[in-house]
Amino acid sequence: MENKKKDKDKSDDRMARPSGRSGHNTRGTGSSSSGVLMVGPNFRVGKKIGCGNFGELRLGKNLYTNEYVAIKLEPMKSRAPQLHLEYRFYKQLGSGDGIPQVYYFGPCGKYNAMVLELLGPSLEDLFDLCDRTFSLKTVLMIAIQLISRMEYVHSKNLIYRDVKPENFLIGRPGNKTQQVIHIIDFGLAKEYIDPETKKHIPYREHKSLTGTARYMSINTHLGKEQSRRDDLEALGHMFMYFLRGSLPWQGLKADTLKERYQKIGDTKRATPIEVLCENFPEMATYLRYVRRLDFFEKPDYDYLRKLFTDLFDRKGYMFDYEYDWIGKQLPTPVGAVQQDPALSSNREAHQHRDKMQQSKNQSADHRAAWDSQQANPHHLRAHLAADRHGGSVQVVSSTNGELNTDDPTAGRSNAPITAPTEVEVMDETKCCCFFKRRKRKTIQRHK
């Protein structure tokens, strides 16, 4: 034991302090002698701030820099492991604008851990903060950035396949990137260029649905393999969601998931672009263009950006990052990381504790993940997305965000359809947000 401790101390002494993005580390870490859970040589694990099919999302702290981070934990025995793949995609993306930094990946006890940059609220959170209405200026500033963001992702031979407002985040309040729209959660991403042949993936049909039904392209509903065009079409649907406040295919009722997805797809096809984009002709031009793209075709990103920059200029707007939420008080991350013992293997104990805490004081639980520097009378009405911190919260909803209009959460939830290896129906609390959501049935689909 004495020799092992000395060896460990020596190896820790040899570890250089990471700056920027650090690499993949294969040495396991866990509880220190003080009972604090550590990831890598310098990341202390704090309270759980999110959960999902992947595992848990924890608040963390870099003990070398005193900066807060997000730590994503996935059980090593996961039936559909994806964290290692997501880490590879992040490294493939590198340090582009609006791409969260990844500081560490490696084992942590019985978990794989990925440490990421901590970001601010998602566009869905900000949409709620602005009474679910964005001005044309705000939507154009978002759209111009996200076309560039998607162009960058595509330039790295990846398609995103998970467009939704919860996956686009501003930076931490007070940071120099606080007004930059970031893209996060690459758990559903895919290489569309074969790394060996350097050729585009082949066109296929009868594919399972991957993405979020509310925003996915019409071709995705039809079971066609996704490519670059589908990411851009999904963005167009999201832009109209912000401008309209809702989409015509929200709130559709159906007896089964299959029927619901079918109805959503049918309604998308039946809704003329001119009706969907009424009073926004440039958005109509955008959608017509991306829907006409060939499966293999490279989109003209410059043309699409120019559609919106020209409109921006005609309206006399200035690209000053004065979004609709500027001037509203945004939440800030908690001011302290709680010491936390090693993760328990008994998941039921964690769930029981969380449910008990929630039942005791739901509003206090809502405030637990975030704490304002001063009294905040304008707390977000919506729950803050856990995947805002670069995490991939793969929550699968039986309604997939298209909730019945009589559901109190209708229009507030937007879970992606994932494609794990087997079907499983669960009835436990799944978080696609920082705070605990209401219980709802979830389902996973075959790939």
Curated annotation (Swiss-Prot):
Molecular function per GO: ATP binding; protein kinase activity; protein serine kinase activity; protein serine/threonine kinase activity
GO cellular-component term (any): cytoplasm
Positions annotated as active site in the UniProt record: D162
GO biological process: endocytosis; positive regulation of canonical Wnt signaling pathway; protein modification process; signal transduction; Wnt signaling pathway
Keywords: Acetylation, ATP-binding, Cytoplasm, Kinase, Nucleotide-binding, Phosphoprotein, Serine/threonine-protein kinase, Transferase, Wnt signaling pathway
Activity regulation behaviour: Inhibited by triazolodiamine 1 (5-amino-3-([4-(aminosulfonyl)phenyl]amino)-N-(2,6-difluorophenyl)-1H-1,2,4-triazole-1-carbothioamide), (S)-propane-1,2-diol, 2-({6-[(3-chlorophenyl)amino]-9-isopropyl-9H-purin-2-yl}amino)-3-methylbutan-1-ol, N2-[(1R,2S)-2-aminocyclohexyl]-N6-(3-chlorophenyl)-9-ethyl-9H-purine-2,6-diamine and [4-amino-2-(3-chloroanilino)-1,3-thiazol-5-yl](4-fluorophenyl)methanone.
One of the Pfam families matching this protein, by short name: Pkinase
SMART domains: S_TKc
Recorded catalytic activity of this chain's protein: L-seryl-[protein] + ATP = O-phospho-L-seryl-[protein] + ADP + H(+); L-threonyl-[protein] + ATP = O-phospho-L-threonyl-[protein] + ADP + H(+)
Start-end of Polar residues biased regions: 22-35, 394-416
Modified residues (N-acetylmethionine): M1
Residue ranges with Basic and acidic residues bias: 1-16, 347-369
Residue ranges of coiled coil: none
Main location: cytoplasm
Annotated stretches, region: Disordered: 1-35, 341-374, 391-416
Domain Protein kinase as annotated: residue spans: 43-313
Record PTM: Autophosphorylated.
Compartments in which it is found: Cytoplasm
Keyword Lipid biosynthesis part of the UniProt annotation: no
Summary of the function given for this chain in its UniProt record: Serine/threonine-protein kinase. Casein kinases are operationally defined by their preferential utilization of acidic proteins such as caseins as substrates. It can phosphorylate a large number of proteins. Participates in Wnt signaling. Regulates fast synaptic transmission mediated by glutamate.
Subunit comment: Monomer.
Family: Belongs to the protein kinase superfamily. CK1 Ser/Thr protein kinase family. Casein kinase I subfamily.
Record's protein name: Casein kinase I isoform gamma-3
